[in-house]
């Protein structure tokens, strides 16, 4: 009787598993994903199928679009769920001039200046600060909406590397836990410039090894003995000015930027030059590190380092349209620290 019961149970399990395609099981295994109930798995599978259909439909015309999409670890989330978890839309239309906006806040006075492009410098056709030794490895913010911390830290890592001639990984967790008095709130979308001000006033930022990332906010555990870099000021880019952004990137190093990343094409981006004409230039939702620019197949692009791990995009990076009237707001709210 026990043997018969066991055989029946095995058949039931086989039938249940057969309801899902092998691609679904492979995707779950690849990303180590499981669900608390069968109901939740069925619901997530429906979303996954819809996303896969969207990706397949786009890729039929990828040559016309100029970029390719791919299923990834965000595949069981709708675009709305993805945006809610990983980003937060903020309207920067009211900011006007970024420098003036920051200086209206007393904590920034005496610490902020606007970038002025050198009059006699000829900019290179291509810039990639990875080859210039100013970019650390691709990191992963996991399920914490703190792209601001990764962008701020990435820009500081770049400035420190260019000053010292070597890279050192700095602590996003230090920013996450300790910049709250400056207006940031852990895993909520906040401001890279608040993070810069924290580093300036605090006398530095710890290294990753002394203050590891845990993807959630805790109490501040900064140790002066663990400091890996300091900062003295903030340089802003004139809002919306891609030419100034290009010059700053080429002459000063990596820049922290905000973009409108709320589109499904960004969620599932794999490679190519992302071109989203209906992107917002003022309602921005995600911070990244701008590390380069160039041209491929006559398409001008910006090269950015994301914080969603090396399996997203081009090994963790993305190329976005350059010289397209500030597409996706890449030059709307851009800044970098000075040492």
Curated annotation (Swiss-Prot):
Annotated positions of the N-methylleucine modification: 123
Top-tier EC class: hydrolase
Highest taxon of source: Eukaryota
Alphabetical UniProt keywords: Hydrolase, Methylation, Phosphoprotein, Protease, Signal, Thiol protease
Signal peptide: 1-18
PTM-bearing positions, type Phosphotyrosine: 219
CDD domains per record: Peptidase_C1A
Cited InterPro entries: Papain-like_cys_pep_sf, Pept_asp_AS, Peptidase_C1A, Peptidase_C1A_C, Peptidase_C1A_papain-like, Prot_inhib_I29
Pfam family, one: Inhibitor_I29
Family label: Belongs to the peptidase C1 family.
Function per UniProt: Polymerizes silica around the axial filament during spicule formation.
Protein name: Silicatein
Lineage summary: Eukaryota, Metazoa, Porifera, Demospongiae, Heteroscleromorpha
């Amino acid at each position: 009787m026990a043997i018969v019961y066991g055989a029946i149970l095995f058949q039931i399990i086989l039938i249940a598993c057969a309801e899902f395609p092998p691609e679904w099981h492979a995707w779950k295994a690849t990303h180590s994903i499981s669900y608390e109930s069968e109901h939740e798995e069925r619901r997530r599978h429906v979303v996954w199928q819809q996303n896969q259909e969207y990706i397949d439909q786009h890729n039929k015309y990828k040559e016309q679009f100029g970029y390719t999409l791919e299923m990834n670890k965000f595949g069981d989330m709708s675009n709305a769920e993805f945006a809610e978890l990983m980003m937060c839309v903020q309207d920067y239309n009211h900011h006007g001039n970024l420098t003036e906006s920051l200086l209206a806040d007393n904590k920034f006075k005496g610490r902020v200046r606007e970038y002025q492009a050198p009059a006699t410098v000829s900019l290179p056709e291509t810039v990639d600060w990875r080859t210039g030794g100013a970019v650390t490895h691709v990191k992963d913010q996991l399920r914490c909406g703190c792209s601001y911390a990764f962008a701020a830290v990435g820009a500081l890592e770049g400035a420190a590397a260019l000053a010292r001639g070597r890279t050192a990984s700095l602590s996003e967790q230090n920013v996450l836990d300790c910049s709250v008095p400056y207006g940031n709130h852990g895993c909520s979308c906040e401001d890279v410039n608040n993070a810069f001000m924290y580093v300036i006033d605090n006398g530095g930022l710890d290294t990753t090894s002394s203050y590891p990332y845990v993807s959630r906010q805790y109490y501040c555990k900064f140790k002066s003995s663990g400091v890996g870099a300091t900062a003295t000021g903030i340089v802003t880019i004139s809002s919306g000015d891609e030419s100034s952004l290009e010059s700053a990137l080429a002459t000063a190093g990596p820049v922290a930027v905000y973009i409108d990343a709320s589109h499904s094409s960004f969620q599932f981006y794999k490679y190519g030059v992302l071109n989203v004409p209906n992107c917002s230039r003022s309602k921005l939702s995600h911070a990244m590190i701008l590390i380069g620019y160039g041209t491929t197949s006559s398409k001008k692009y910006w090269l950015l380092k994301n914080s969603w791990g090396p399996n997203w995009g081009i090994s963790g990076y993305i190329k976005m349209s350059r010289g397209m009237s500030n597409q996706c707001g890449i030059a709307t709210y851009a800044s970098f620290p000075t040492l």
